[in-house]
Every structure is written in C-alpha cells, then in structure tokens.
Design a protein with these regions (language model features):
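Hydrophobic/aromatic-enriched cytosolic interaction surfaces used to assemble or bind macromolecules
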Residues: 1-304
C-alpha cells in the first residue's frame, strides 16, 4: 500500500460531500519528494440510499463508510512506529448551507463584529436561532462588501463526530462556492460580470459591479433541469434580473461567466443578451451520472 493511499493510517484525505453520495480521495502533500511515486489510489464514492438523499443522516452514514478501509484492500505488515490520526479536508455541496453578499461599510469593524452582522442576516432571513448556525464571513478588499456563509451547527458537529468515529480528525470543512469563486474570477474578462455556477441541485449566481461584490442569487435545480438547456438559460437570466435590481447594470454592460459541469445550456441565447460569455467549465454536455451519483467527485478538487 502506498503511504499516500486513502487507507494509510496517517495520510490526510480529501472528502467531497454531495447530496446523494460522498467521494473520498488522497490528499496531495504540499511538498512531495521528486522521486516519490504517485499514489495509485484514486478517488472512490459511497452512494447514499435513495431514501437518504438530501439528508444529514445520509451524509453522516456515507461519510463514515467512505472513511472505512475498502473491503478488498490489503494492508501489509509495517514496522510499529507512531502514526498520527488521519486528517480530513471536507468540501460540501452548497445545498448544505447558505450564502449571502452584504453591502456596507465594514472597514473599521473587528472580525467578531463582522461575523455577528452575518449571523444576524441569516437569523433574520431564515428565521433560525443564531446559536444553531456556524457563520464564516470574508470582507472584500476595500471594506464595502462581505461574502458570508452559514452552516447548520448540527451538520458541522455531525461531520466532526462521524470523522472521529472512523478514526479521523476533521481539519477543514467548507462550502464549495467560495472555493469556486476564488479559482474562476481571474478568468472573467470584465469588471462587470455575473458568474453562474450550475451543478447538481443548485444554480447560483454572483454579480460583480465595478469589481465589487454586488449580489448573490440561488435557485433550485430539480430532476431533469440539468438536461434542459432552455430551463438552465432561463434560470440564469432570471438570476441576473433579480441581482441587477440592486445595481445600475444592464445585460449589455455585463459579461457572464458560466460554470456548468455536466449542465446543458444554450450559450448562443446568453451571448445574445450579455456583453460576452465565458465558459469556465465544460457545458452543453449533459452527463446524468448513473446510479444516483452526485457532484461529490467534482468537489474533491476544491478540497485540495
């Protein structure tokens, strides 16, 4: 067994948690010796039973199963040396949380005050108890906008407990959208842009005006929507209409960046409406994954 394989007792691993499956793969060390062979272990997936799709219980059970050694894996005898607990880095499908972009003057606020503003927003918007959510907020350079995310505390605690029960320690837990934004914004050609991320159960949009975060929008994708180009295109246009209400932007002034792995979209229709359209990931190819698989395998790259 390679020391970098998923089942190695001390190896850190990446986890992608979708709505219908959990994917697990080896984590690449930051510094790898030049002569060290690449790990032969690839990612593997653990599907949730259909009755547990979109449920925390299904995610917890699949996470525990994903962290267990494969039944047919053969672990050779190794010298008895102290080994550290496996660390897991988890990225969640955005279905499991909520996001928001808040505008204001945050320049003089401390991190705790910024978090409390974000918490108050989610409490007011969704009517939840502030103690039941875990909030993360990031203020954009310049201090005039904040990107905030919230996760149910029960989900965070459950992920930590499921990892611990399988002999692993949760080192990181994050939602996918902020990671996708960080990796795709440099590919957008204009200061005014709407970036659309369509994957699995959600179509999300982030509108940027003059280089500043302006608005966030999210809509649900239901069964069959991903393979309906007209539907996906309509949802993208509706997202712009809602976001643009808070700005002075028009379609013709705004570029569009579309990330739609496995999502069918009518790019020609979007190109006729927006100043330009940039495809940030393969689109116009509907890949309905067999066996109820979800977006989980794609999440692994954002856990690295």
């Amino acid at each position: 067994m390679s020391p970098w394989s998923i089942d190695s007792p001390g190896a850190d691993i990446n986890i992608g948690i979708g709505t219908r499956e959990v994917a697990v793969g080896p984590r690449r060390p930051r510094w790898t010796p030049a002569r060290k062979p690449a790990s032969p272990a690839g990612p593997r997936s653990v599907p949730m039973p259909e009755t547990q799709w979109f449920t925390q219980a299904g995610a917890f059970d699949a996470l525990r199963a994903a962290l267990e050694p494969e039944p047919d894996s053969v672990v050779p005898q190794a010298p008895r040396v102290p080994s550290r607990t496996r660390g897991v880095h988890i990225v969640l499908d955005d279905f499991w949380g909520n996001h928001a972009i808040l505008r204001g003057d945050f320049r003089t606020l401390r991190a705790r005050e910024v978090d409390e503003i974000a918490r108050a927003h989610f409490v007011d918007t969704y009517g939840v108890d502030g103690e039941t959510i875990v909030v993360r907020a990031c203020v954009q350079r310049g201090g005039r906008a904040m990107f905030a995310s919230a996760l149910p505390r029960a989900l965070v605690d459950g992920m930590r407990e499921a990892s611990a029960s399988a002999g692993a320690r949760m080192l990181a837990l994050k939602l996918c959208l902020p990671e996708m934004l960080n990796r795709t914004l440099h590919s957008t050609p204009r200061a005014n842009v709407m970036v659309v991320f369509a994957a699995d159960a959600l179509i999300q949009a982030v509108l940027i005006e003059a280089g500043c975060w302006a608005c966030y929008d999210v809509q649900r994708l239901f069964a069959g929507d991903a393979c309906d180009p007209a539907k996906v295109t309509l949802l993208a246009e509706q997202a712009f209409e809602r976001c643009a209400e808070r700005t002075t932007l028009r379609h013709e002034d705004c570029a569009l960046g579309f990330y739609g792995s496995g999502i069918a979209v009518d790019l020609a229709a979007l190109q006729a409406r927006f100043a330009s359209v940039t495809t940030l990931a393969p689109s116009n190819a509907c890949h309905e994954l067999e066996g109820g698989e979800s977006f989980a395998r794609h999440l692994l790259e954002y856990a690295q």
